[in-house]
C-alpha cells in the first residue's frame, strides 16, 4: 500500500491561493449568454447559480459600454486561518486531533475591479458565491481522508467510472421550461464508448484499525506426519481385514459350540450308564488297597434255604443238610449236584474279556495268565469268575 503524501502549512496555503485565483479568473471574465452551456448539460445542484451568473454577466456586454480590464490585487493578509498543528502527545487525554487542512474561518470571497483609465478601485462580492464555496471546499478536502461534500464522483455510485460521463438520476422536479421525460427505464451500462463500467471499491476508513495476528509457525515435519498417517491407514486396513475374517468364521464357532454341547450330553449319558453297571456288578470299593481286601477274605459257613439254583456249585465241600424232621445231617448221605448247562456261544464274551484284560492289566505276566484262562473257559460261569478277577486286579 502506497504511503499518503504529506504537505506542510506553506504548501497548503499556496495550493489554496492558486485555486482561489483560478476561480476569480473565470468568474471575472464576461460570459456570452448565447454561447453559454445549456441548462440540460449543467449538473444538478448548481444550475440556478450558473444560470443567474451567466445572465448577469451577459447584460453589461450587450447594453453598457466596454468594461475596463480587471487586475487582481493580491493582499498580503491571509483571509482565513489554518488549524494549529499541536503535537498529539501535548493534548489532553481523549481529545480529538484537529485536521490541519480544514480552515477554522471561511470568509466570503471578494472581487476587486481596477479602472486603468481613471484608476478607480471598486470591490464587491462574487455573483456566484455558492460556486466559489463549492470549489473552495473541494480544494480544502482533496488532501484529507474525509469524503468530499460534492456529489460528483461519489464512491457509493456503482456506475461511477473515472474518465467517463457521470450517470445522474432522473430529476423529480422540472427546471424552468424543461419537464421530466417518463420514457424507457433501461440505461446504458457504459457511459464512455466501449469501456465497460467498473464499480469503484469502497473507501477504507482511517478510523478502523486492522487487526493483525501473528503468522503461524512453519510446519517442518509435514512429510513425517503424512508418512505416519499413511502407516496408520495401512494398519487400519489390515485390522479391518482380520475383523472380516473373524466375522466369517463366527458361524463355524457356533457349530463347534453346538457339537461340544452334544458331546457333553453323550459323556453324561455314558457316566450314568457306567454308574448303573457298577451298581449291578459291584466289586471292591474304590480307594481301598488290594492287600486289605485279600486279608479280609476267609472261609465262612453258608446256609442255603430252599432248593438250590442250577448255577450253584457244591463240589468237594462238606455240607450239612436238614432231613425230613429238620435235623441237621452231614452231606455224606446226600450230595447236591449241579445241573448241566445248555451250550452257548461264548466267543463274544471271550473277546470282550481279552480286551478288558489288555486295557486294565498293566503287568505282562498277569495279562498272559488271564488270557490263557479266558481261552480255556468253557462255560459262562467260568467267564464271569474270570471277569471278576480281572476287575479286582485292575483296582
Curated annotation (Swiss-Prot):
Entry GO terms, CC: host cell cytoplasm
InterPro entries: P/V_Pprotein_paramyxoviral (IPR004897), Soyouz_module (IPR025909)
Region (Disordered): 178-217
Keyword check for Phosphoprotein: yes
Bias (Low complexity) ranges: 206-217
Entry text on domains: The N-terminus consists of a long intrinsically disordered tail. The central part contains the coiled-coil multimerization domain (PMD). Forms a four-stranded coiled coil structure. The C-terminus constitutes the alpha-helical domain that binds to the nucleocapsid (N-RNA complex).
Recorded family membership: Belongs to the rubulavirus/avulavirus P protein family.
Protein name: Phosphoprotein
Amino acid at each position: 500500500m502506497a504511503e499518503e503524501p504529506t504537505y506542510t502549512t506553506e504548501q497548503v496555503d499556496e495550493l489554496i491561493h492558486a485555486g482561489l485565483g483560478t476561480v476569480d479568473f473565470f468568474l471575472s471574465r464576461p460570459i456570452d449568454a448565447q454561447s453559454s452551456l445549456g441548462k440540460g448539460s449543467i449538473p444538478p445542484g448548481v444550475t440556478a447559480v450558473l444560470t443567474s451568473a451567466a445572465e448577469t454577466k451577459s447584460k453589461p456586454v450587450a447594453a453598457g459600454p466596454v468594461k475596463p480590464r480587471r487586475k487582481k490585487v493580491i493582499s498580503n493578509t491571509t483571509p482565513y486561518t489554518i488549524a494549529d498543528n499541536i503535537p498529539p502527545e501535548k493534548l489532553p487525554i481523549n481529545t480529538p486531533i484537529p485536521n490541519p487542512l480544514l480552515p477554522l474561518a471561511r470568509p466570503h470571497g471578494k472581487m476587486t475591479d481596477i479602472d486603468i483609465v481613471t484608476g478607480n478601485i471598486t470591490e464587491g462580492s462574487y455573483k456566484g458565491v455558492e460556486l466559489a464555496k463549492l470549489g473552495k471546499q473541494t480544494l480544502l478536502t482533496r488532501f484529507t481522508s474525509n469524503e468530499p461534500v460534492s456529489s460528483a464522483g461519489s464512491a457509493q455510485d456503482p456506475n461511477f467510472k473515472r474518465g467517463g460521463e457521470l450517470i445522474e438520476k432522473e430529476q423529480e422536479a422540472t427546471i424552468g421550461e424543461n419537464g421530466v421525460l417518463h420514457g424507457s427505464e433501461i440505461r446504458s451500462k457504459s457511459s464512455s464508448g466501449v469501456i465497460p463500467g467498473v464499480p469503484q471499491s469502497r473507501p477504507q476508513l482511517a478510523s478502523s484499525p486492522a487487526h493483525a495476528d501473528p503468522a503461524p509457525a512453519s510446519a517442518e515435519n509435514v512429510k513425517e506426519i503424512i508418512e505416519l498417517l499413511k502407516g496408520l491407514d495401512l494398519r487400519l486396513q489390515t485390522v479391518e481385514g482380520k475383523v472380516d475374517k473373524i466375522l466369517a468364521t463366527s458361524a463355524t464357532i457356533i457349530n463347534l459350540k453346538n457339537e461340544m454341547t452334544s458331546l457333553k450330553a453323550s459323556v453324561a449319558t455314558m457316566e450314568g450308564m457306567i454308574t448303573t453297571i457298577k451298581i449291578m456288578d459291584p466289586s471292591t470299593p474304590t480307594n481301598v488297597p488290594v492287600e486289605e481286601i485279600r486279608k479280609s477274605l476267609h472261609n465262612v459257613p453258608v446256609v442255603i434255604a430252599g432248593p438250590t439254583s442250577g448255577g450253584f456249585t457244591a463240589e468237594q465241600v462238606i455240607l450239612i443238610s436238614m432231613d425230613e424232621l429238620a435235623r441237621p445231617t452231614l452231606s455224606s448221605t446226600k450230595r447236591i449236584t449241579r445241573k448241566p448247562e445248555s451250550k452257548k456261544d461264548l466267543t463274544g464274551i471271550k473277546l470282550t474279556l481279552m480286551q478288558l484284560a489288555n486295557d486294565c492289566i498293566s503287568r505282562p505276566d498277569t495279562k498272559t495268565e488271564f488270557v490263557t484262562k479266558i481261552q480255556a473257559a468253557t462255560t459262562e460261569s467260568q467267564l464271569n469268575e474270570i471277569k471278576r478277577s480281572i476287575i479286582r486286579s485292575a483296582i
